[in-house]
């Protein structure tokens, strides 16, 4: 990261039009590809719906009002107001509401665990979205070219493998095409919808909520089951909030209301219109509404759109993991920047290959998009419920709304969310168990790391020596001073770094300038360079340098030293500076803390994390690592 964070997505602030186009290409990919499978799943034979014009009107009415209430009202109008210095998403919202509660209170722990669990469920989404999106697009070959049906899974696997293989090179160049391609996709959706709407305009009666309510009342059990499939039109709604920091709330709102929502509505109503005249089209309503001559081009366009939707989710997984590392919930991992122009363009090899294996496994195991649809909703509904809870806390604690108003708004949204959540629980046995298992495993790992780090800090403080009195005593009877600068990286400036104690014990020297450098992650996404550094002169050429970072930034030692030169007048010659880092070996023990098996898991995670020198981007030939053992 080599640029100011005051404009953290683009180097030059583009026009609103360019931001809207960018948002269309990135933010709406997931929700924009739902027409490929959502209505098809609603009329699945397994739901037992007696096909009739009333059933079509009822389902389309449910789709329409679900999108209005959940996306347009809940997310676009209310939730997107809950920004953390412009950033959105469940982790940013969690950090925002945690500022309003006592740090170590029970309420803070509950809110933290809710936020982390909601974030972890995104990993389930990150696995299923590429699989179901690309698979459903390629399944169009079964209609466009039936002789190629046997190649649907191999083609899907090749596309997905290629998508993950190019991640290491970055997608900044291709990203310029995302906006135009997705714009063409949405216009195609709208055009197809209009084509069938003019043939059966009576489908527009579904705008009246009477049809949704009547369907729910008269077909209670079947309607409740179908509700889980109706939710598929909402997958990707959370992305509007998550990507708010990249494009801003206004461009996303414009993109939604001007292009995306109208085109989606037209397409869903068009699919419904086709079903009124051709009930057999329920087998695959999206592709069967496409004229024969346009089948192959539509398969190609749909494949491009689903690849773009998958890319957005993969990038989201990288970003989420990076945030979790900065907030102290995951060990350090290698983070590579794939674009000099966009801070958001990062690549984490471990996450990339793990996602690739899981996505390929899911496609091979589930085989068809309708099988994956059962697994899709549960992860997204869980995150939505948690977002609603945290947003309600924000309304009361941050915005200071009247409790009665918070209760009315919060209750309205939570009832809708819980209805979808309950309907999706029915699908747990059919595949919903997979994202739940994946999210729960991620949550367990994150909480194990968080708890293990707390234990490690507690042990270090118990055995630690207060820093400033130690330095005062050391300077009173100084060891031999040598030329150059020693930078000791430490997580706690209150205690003497173990690396300094080892250096004094074995080398018996002290550099002419000693800097204790610590990185502190704030509960905001970005910290401006003017407020990043603070320095305390302890005397005798010894300094305590604190560098603050936001949870969406990655510390960079070279950048800190350059900033210290510009802002504080502390010049560092890199080739005359040695960086001392303590490499801790964690030893599980029977001391009070976590169960032994969980401490062993933490020790394994600690051992396999990226080296501090790699993570902090320190030249390898300037690093001195000193090992130490710590029992927890």
From Swiss-Prot:
* Classification via Pfam families: K_trans, K_trans_C
Q: Which GO terms describe its cellular component?
A: plasma membrane
Membrane-crossing ranges are 19-39, 59-79, 110-130, 146-166, 178-198, 213-233, 256-276, 298-318, 346-366, 373-393, 403-423, 428-448
The chemistry this enzyme catalyses reads: K(+)(in) + H(+)(in) = K(+)(out) + H(+)(out)
Q: Extract one GO molecular function annotation from the record.
A: symporter activity
Its keywords, alphabetically, are: Cell inner membrane, Cell membrane, Ion transport, Membrane, Potassium, Potassium transport, Symport, Transmembrane, Transmembrane helix, Transport
Q: Which gene encodes it?
A: kup1
Q: Which family does it belong to?
A: Belongs to the HAK/KUP transporter (TC 2.A.72) family.
Q: Which taxonomic lineage is given here?
A: Bacteria, Pseudomonadati, Pseudomonadota, Betaproteobacteria, Burkholderiales
| HAMAP family the UniProt entry points to | Kup
As for subcellular location, the record says: Cell inner membrane
Protein name in the entry: Probable potassium transport system protein Kup 1
- Principal subcellular localization: membrane
What does this gene product do?
Transport of potassium into the cell. Likely operates as a K(+):H(+) symporter.
Q: How does it sit in the membrane?
A: Multi-pass membrane protein
Entry-linked PANTHER family: LOW AFFINITY POTASSIUM TRANSPORT SYSTEM PROTEIN KUP, OSMOTIC STRESS POTASSIUM TRANSPORTER
């Amino acid at each position: 990261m080599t640029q100011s964070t005051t404009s953290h997505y683009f180097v030059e602030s583009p026009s609103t039009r360019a931001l809207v186009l960018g948002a269309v290409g990135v933010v709406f990919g997931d929700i924009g590809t739902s027409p490929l499978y959502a209505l098809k799943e609603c009329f699945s034979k397994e739901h037992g719906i007696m096909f009739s014009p009333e059933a079509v009107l009822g389902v389309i009415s449910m789709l329409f009002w679900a999108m209005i209430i959940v996306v347009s009202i809940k997310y676009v109008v209310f939730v997107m107001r809950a920004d953390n210095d412009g950033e959105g998403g469940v982790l940013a919202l969690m950090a925002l509401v945690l500022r309003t509660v006592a740090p170590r209170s029970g309420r803070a722990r509950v809110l933290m665990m809710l936020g982390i669990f909601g974030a972890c469920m995104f990993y389930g989404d990150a696995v299923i979205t590429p699989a179901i999106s690309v698979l459903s697009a390629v399944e169009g070959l079964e209609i466009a070219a039936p002789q190629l049906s046997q190649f649907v899974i191999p083609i899907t696997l090749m596309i997905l493998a290629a998508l993950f293989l190019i991640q290491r090179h970055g997608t900044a160049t291709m990203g310029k095409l995302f906006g135009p391609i997705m714009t063409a996709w949405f216009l195609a959706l709208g055009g197809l919808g209009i084509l069938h709407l003019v043939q059966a305009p009576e489908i527009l009666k579904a705008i009246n909520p009477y049809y949704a309510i009547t369907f729910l009342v008269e077909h209670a059990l079947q309607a409740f089951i179908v509700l889980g499939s109706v939710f598929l039109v909402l997958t990707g709604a959370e992305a509007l909030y998550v990507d708010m920091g990249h494009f801003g709330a206004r461009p996303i709102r414009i993109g939604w209301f001007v292009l995306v929502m109208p085109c989606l509505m037209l397409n869903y109503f068009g699919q419904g219109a086709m079903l009124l005249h051709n009930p057999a089209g329920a087998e695959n309503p999206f592709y069967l509404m496409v004229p024969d001559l346009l089948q192959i081009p539509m398969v190609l366009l749909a494949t491009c759109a689903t690849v773009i939707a998958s890319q957005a989710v993969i990038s989201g997984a990288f970003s989420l993991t990076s945030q979790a590392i900065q907030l102290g919930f995951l060990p350090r991992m290698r983070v590579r920047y794939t674009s000099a122009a966009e801070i958001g363009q990062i690549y984490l090899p471990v996450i990339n290959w793990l996602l690739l294996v899981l996505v390929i496994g899911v496609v091979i195991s589930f085989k068809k998009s309708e099988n994956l649809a059962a697994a899709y909703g549960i992860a997204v509904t869980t995150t939505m419920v948690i977002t609603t809870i945290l947003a309600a806390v924000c309304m009361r604690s941050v915005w200071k709304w009247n409790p009665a108003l918070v209760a009315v708004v919060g209750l309205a949204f939570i009832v809708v969310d819980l209805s979808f959540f309950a309907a999706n629980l029915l699908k747990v046995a059919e595949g919903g168990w997979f994202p739940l298992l994946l999210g729960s495993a991620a949550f367990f790992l994150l909480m194990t790391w968080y708890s293990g780090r707390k234990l490690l800090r507690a042990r270090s403080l118990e055995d630690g020596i207060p820093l400033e009195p130690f330095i005062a005593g050391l300077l009173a009877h100084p060891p031999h001073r040598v030329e150059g600068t020693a930078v000791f990286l430490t997580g706690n400036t209150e205690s003497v770094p173990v690396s300094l104690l080892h250096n004094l014990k074995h080398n018996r020297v002290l550099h002419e300038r000693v800097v204790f450098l610590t990185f502190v992650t704030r509960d905001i996404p970005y910290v401006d360079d003017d407020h990043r550094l603070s320095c305390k002169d302890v005397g005798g050429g010894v300094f305590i340098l604190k560098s603050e970072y936001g949870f969406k930034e990655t510390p960079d030692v070279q950048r800190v030293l350059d900033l210290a030169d510009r802002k504080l007048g502390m010049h560092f010659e890199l080739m005359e500076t040695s960086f001392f880092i303590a490499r801790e070996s964690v030893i599980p023990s029977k001391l009070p803390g976590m169960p032994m098996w969980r401490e062993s898991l933490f020790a394994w995670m600690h051992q396999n994390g990226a080296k501090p020198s790699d993570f902090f981007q320190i030249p390898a030939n300037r690093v001195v690592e000193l090992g130490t053992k710590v029992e927890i």
